[in-house]
Amino acid sequence: LTSVPEETGSPEEQAPPLPRLQLRDPLPPVIDTVDDYVAYCARLALGHGPVALDAERASGYRYSQRAYLVQVRRDGSGTGLVDPIAFDDLVDLDEAIGDAEWILHAATQDLPCLAEVGLHPTALFDTELAGRLLNLPRVGLASLSWSTTSG
């Protein structure tokens, strides 16, 4: 018989510490007035580089896949939390983005509801698809974020 070494400490003690998450900027208010929307679109147009987007749907509470919040981030323009329900469409936001590359996670989930409000990418980078192409074992946003920042 061989002996199995006894484990010391609980799994929590053996796991590496989780990174401390901090917002880069203060949490912005939700954009739900025309004046705030126009001002954010102007800032977004002056930004540079790709644009990160995310749509929040209320599919657990509603029968539609409509976007109820659109989150936007671009270097030089900050974060925008746009309430698409407050506006007829988000065509001005689409024009402010122009031909900048979009960065989404699980793009197939968000593209239909973003198109419904007038947002259409000309170039797209999907972080979930990138994780699959890299043959990563987990491609959820949290797992990808952890694997790319903990290294």
Annotated model-derived regions:
Residues 48-53, 57-64, 81, 87-88:
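An N-terminal domain-cap segment
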Residues 40-46, 59-64, 71-72:
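Short secondary-structure boundary/capping segments within folded domains
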Residues 18-30, 68-151:
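Active-site-proximal helix-loop-helix substrate-binding element of RNase H-like nuclease domains
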